[in-house]
Amino acid sequence: MQTVEETYPIRKSPRIPQYDYSTVNSYFVTICTHERRCVFYTKGRLNPLGLVAQNCLLEIPKRYVGYRIDKFVVMPNHVHAIITIDAAVGKNLSYVIGQYKSVVSKVGHQLYPGLEVWQRSFHDHVIRNQRRYDLIWNYIENNPLQWKEDCFYLHDT
């Protein structure tokens, strides 16, 4: 009989080893859709699932004390956000993003049965100073204008 390790590939975590992701800090988060499919936009506008992704992101500070969404954008096939943890809280960033993805997926399955919304995990960057924060804030602000040059761009929506 095969072990779990022999059956499934061992994936390297994209998180910084031994870093506490519940630490007071700002984080640049990118969450991509499954196979980078453009599921959040129809004809260049947020569709019902895109609105769910947006509204659920805005709910994070209401559900998790100490969390703040400083800047975000829902793009056709990914979400960018600056998430700040203001106070030491029990829930780390991975838990909160996991819950966000779960809620959006659940509604996505109701709207579009059989749709796999998200790719596994998410990308994060610990923002270590104001200069990086400002650069990332501007990147998110300008992301919709630069969609065709974006590394996540596959085709027009």
PLM regions with names:
Residues 1-157:
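Short catalytic/metal-binding and nucleic-acid-binding patches
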